[in-house]
Swiss-Prot record:
InterPro entries found in the cross-reference section: ATP-dep_Helicase, DEAD/DEAH_assoc, DEAD/DEAH_box_helicase_dom, Helicase_ATP-bd, Helicase_C-like, Lhr-like_ATP-dep_RNA_helic_prd, Lhr_WH_dom, P-loop_NTPase
GO MF annotation: an example: helicase activity
Keyword Glycoprotein found: no
Entry domain remark: Composed of 2 helicase domains, a winged-helix (WH) domain and Lhr-specific domain 4. Deletion of domain 4 leads to decreased ATPase activity, slightly decreased DNA-binding and loss of DNA unwinding or annealing activites; the isolated domain binds ssDNA and RNA less well than intact protein.
Organism, scientific name: Thermococcus barophilus (strain DSM 11836 / MP)
NCBIfam families xref list: PRK13767.1
Protein name: ATP-dependent helicase Lhr-Core protein 2
Length: 863
């Protein structure tokens, strides 16, 4: 049974279980226990699995380690401490690992000193880190004399499990601590780790599992994820310690200008930097988060340029920077040498960065959990308040952040989504298992299903992965895909095959795809530049985009290259900054829909401003801006909300545009829009352009192919969204690129073989060839199934798109169809994505201003 911890132990009760030197050390250093420690330490001591959800700076890492360290000290005191690994600590960040080692070695040294003063000598408790940075010399030392506490990453653990000598050393593990669970649960690195833990448990017998997480929801699911399942299908028992709100959080939403529509870009930018300067001046250390890496660079650059006093005091920190640069920034921050750091996502995790007084978010963080994680970096100690300010730059952002801040204050978190049954990760582990010994098929199936991500795995899918590994799909051999295991279904057994198999496993395990820069060439082979793979995924033939200040039309792709044709003066269909944007969570999107209804009902209330200011704690500027925005929409068109879905048709000289106001987040909108565009292009026999945002999507057709209201209503009666989307994905760049990732993880295309690294271009060509072969001959091939699952469930959000469609079908949401001369105010942001190349934010604002002026004239609001 999984239950919430009810009992808060007293300091005395905890001191009672601690060894004398540990007790004295703790008393001297901290004096008293923090909430997570009061709930967790004794339970871990008793051998319970525990998940701790608490803010940064609440001592959760020590809560996890204290009981384990205490046990090691007790053993040491009795002379029973052996040379073996007792504690395994796994974290997704290599940087975090070095932090943890430092933060463990110090207390261990101090405890030995205390013991020495008390008159007895304790043996040294050794701590070691094993990651891809660890030298083979260090690794050999660990085999000969294993550390008592081993610190590692999910990737290195998977390799260690198959290291013949070292895996023997893992048999003695008693405690496993998984840190930053929130950063693992939603992706395949987490899947990878959970399978490793089940394999470890099979090797070492039962151990205590301790999960540490920042703010995350629903905790029951996350606990099942960390603890795993019993063979009868019930979750393993354990405790949830939820002290995620032990720390006070203050969140303010601010607009840097009074008028978000008419302020020109230069003034807006001036106001933003002026406000940032004020905030940095008022606080000792400020951490600024932008939503993109390029944004982080830009903000840091402008702050230094505009305010020379900050030249040495401001740095940027994001994942594109080299490791050394990042470490240097973290060190400076810890020593208090910086006034401000600008980051994209790289500082969200618990790297120890010393004390931060204020966190500023520029633009919406798109999810309540992310907002709380980022703002939780402020006030690093428990009694300090986490102060956060969100600065908004447009009206949609203002509405979204108003709801987001309200949810954060009222602890309404977004649900996380844990990938289910990723077959590519399963391939790696079944191969890893075959390297250990000969397995009974049913035993292996049972083991896999103990891991949360696979607790619903069908036997069919499991067998299809084994059959693929055993080379039972004809036609793959000549594509150089060879069998890696033998499989005897009659006997119900499988095992390793081939000398090279172990090397293949070592060289190719892991879940993070190699990031590719895609080269862009003209058809006559002239090199133009590179784009990110994420950007290339979005391209469809005929798409027009800007690179190095010129416009090009996408023609085709070969391997790692894409070919284009210069198209001077053509209007781009895809903005360059699109690939990095964070998607809005579905739960928050629904709350914004409800907020729209609430504001709609306030529009004629003379006290509207006051009501909004009180309930949502926004200032007068913000309340006025929101009400103004909604009044314009209501006058010109209809306000879509949780019961009304607005679809607008806007005709231009040559094109017909359809705006679907489906406020369900970009991931769900991507699923819907691609399926709809596919159906329309089949029916009308023409190309359909798509633009997608969190608040809806737009379809663009030639004017003579326009859709009737009936056509649009029929789209929403769509029977099978999955099947339609699958057809829509056929031949897309997205499918080709994602298939390479899945084929890498599923060892169909090896990144490294015989000590050589295969070029990404080569891999991509192989992927395209294999994809064609499999689609034609084996539509049920496990890795083909997985690439569709990954795109539809992890990249897009098909489940919530289906849910939304069902609400429309059941009539819970009514469709309102309008023909408008211009897009309504709520559609402005979509119009811009599909309108002009808004490489520059200035052009965006200019365009919105022009649209706004025309509409105000139409509803008679211009003097």
């Amino acid at each position: 049974m999984i239950r919430f911890a009810q009992r808060e132990y007293t300091d005395e009760e905890i001191y009672e279980i601690l060894a004398d030197p540990v007790r004295e050390w703790f008393r001297g250093k901290f004096g008293t226990f923090t909430p997570p420690q009061r709930y967790a330490v004794i339970e871990i001591h008793k051998g319970e699995n525990v998940l701790i959800s608490s803010p940064t700076g609440s001592g959760k890492t020590l809560s996890a380690f204290l009981a384990a360290i205490n046990e090691l000290i007790l053993l040491g005191k009795e002379g029973k401490l052996e040379d073996k690994i007792y504690v395994l600590y796994v974290s997704p960040l290599r940087a975090l690992n070095n932090d943890i080692r430092r933060n463990l070695e110090e207390p261990l040294r101090e405890i030995r000193e205390v013991a020495h003063e008390m008159g007895y000598d304790l043996p040294e408790i050794r701590v070691a880190v094993r990651t891809s940075d660890t030298s083979s010399y260090e690794k050999q030392k660990m085999v000969k004399k294993p550390p008592h506490i081993l610190i590692t990453t999910p990737e290195s653990l998977a390799i260690a499990l198959n290291a013949p000598k070292f895996s023997e050393r893992l048999k003695t593990v008693k405690y496993v601590i998984v840190d930053e669970v929130h950063a693992l649960a939603e992706n395949k690195r987490g899947t990878h780790l959970m399978l490793s833990l089940e394999r470890l448990q099979n090797l070492a017998g039962d151990f205590v599992r301790i999960g540490l997480s920042a703010t995350i929801h629903p905790l029951e699911e996350v606990a099942k994820f960390v603890f795993g399942f019993n063979d009868d299908g019930t979750p393993r028992s354990g405790l949830i310690v939820d002290v995620s709100f032990a720390k006070k959080t203050e969140i303010k939403v601010e607009s840097v200008v009074g008028d978000l529509v008419y302020t020109d870009a230069a003034t807006l930018s001036e106001a933003l930097y002026k406000r940032l300067d004020e905030l940095i001046e008022q606080h000792r250390t400020t951490l600024i988060f932008t939503n993109t890496r390029s944004g982080a660079e830009r903000v840091a650059y402008h702050l230094k340029k505009k305010f020379p006093k900050y030249a040495e005091l401001i740095e940027a920190h994001h994942s594109s920077l080299s490791r050394d640069v990042r470490l240097e920034v973290e060190e400076k921050l810890k020593k208090g040498e910086l006034r401000c750091v600008v980051s994209s996502t790289s500082l969200e995790l618990g790297i120890d960065i010393g004390s931060i007084d204020l966190v500023v978010l520029i633009g919406s963080p798109k999810s309540v959990n992310r907002a709380l994680q980022r703002i939780g970096r402020a006030g690093h100690r428990l009694h300090e308040v986490s102060k956060g300010i969100i600065l908004v730059l447009d009206r949609d952002d203002l509405v979204e952040c108003t709801v987001l801040a309200y949810n954060a204050r009222n602890r309404r978190l977004d649900r996380i989504k844990i990938p289910q049954n990723p077959l590519d990760v399963l391939v790696q582990h079944l191969l890893g298992m075959a390297l250990e010994k000969v397995w009974d098929i049913n035993e292996a199936y049972k083991l896999v299903r103990r891991a949360y991500p696979y607790h619903n795995l069908s036997f069919e899918d499991f067998m299809s992965v084994l059959r693929y590994l055993a080379g039972e799909y004809a036609g793959l051999e000549e594509k150089k895909v060879y069998a890696k295991i033998w499989l005897d279904e009659k006997e119900g057994k499988f095992g390793r095959r081939g000398k090279m198999t172990r090397a293949i496993y070592y060289m190719n395990t892991g879940t993070i795809p190699d990031e590719a820069k895609i080269e862009v060439y003209t058809l006559d082979r002239r090199f133009i530049g590179t784009v990110e793979e994420e950007f290339a995924e979005r391209l469809m033939p005929g798409d027009i985009f800007v690179l190095a200040g010129r416009t090009y039309e996408f023609k085709k792709s070969r391997g790692n290259r894409i070919y284009v044709e210069p198209k001077e003066g053509a209007k781009p269909t895809i903005p360059a900054w699109f690939s990095e944007m964070l998607p809005l969570s579905f739960d928050l999107a629904l709350d914004v829909q409800r907020f729209r209804k609430e504001v709609k009902e306030l529009l004629n209330n003379p006290k509207a401003e006051q009501i909004l200011m009180e309930k949502y704690r926004i200032d007068e500027k913000a309340a006025k801006a929101i009400l103004g925005y909604f009044r314009e929409q209501a006058k010109y068109s209809t306000i879509p909300d949780d019961g009304i879905l607005l679809v607008e048709e806007v005709l231009e000289e040559r094109r017909a545009k359809y705006f679907f106001h489906t406020l369900i987040g970009r991931r769900a909108n991507e699923a819907l829009s691609r399926a709809f565009a596919y159906l329309v292009s089949k029916k009308k026999r023409c190309n359909v352009g798509i633009a997608i945002s969190d608040n809806g999507f737009m379809l663009i057709l030639p004017r003579e192919k326009r859709l009737s209201e009936e056509d649009i209503r029929t789209l929403f009666q769509l029977e099978d969204l999955r099947e339609t989307l699958k057809k829509a994905l056929d031949n897309t760049e997205l499918l080709k690129r994602r298939f390479r990732h899945v084929a890498n993880r599923g060892l169909l295309i090896l990144r490294r073989y015989m000590g050589r690294k295969k070029s990404l271009s080569r891999q991509q060509l192989n992927a395209q060839t294999l994809l064609r072969l499999l689609k034609k001959n084996y539509p049920d091939f496990p890795l083909l199934k997985e690439v569709y699952r990954e795109i539809m469930e992890d990249k897009m959000d098909i489940k919530n798109a289906e849910l939304f469609l069902s609400w429309v079908k059941e009539g819970k949401i009514k469709i309102v169809f309008e023909q408008n001369e211009l897009p309504s105010p709520f559609a402005f942001n979509l119009e811009i994505i599909g309108a002009s190349d808004v490489v520059l934010m200035e052009d965006r604002r200019e365009l919105i201003k022009q649209l706004h002026r025309k509409i105000m004239a139409m509803i008679g609001e211009l003097e």
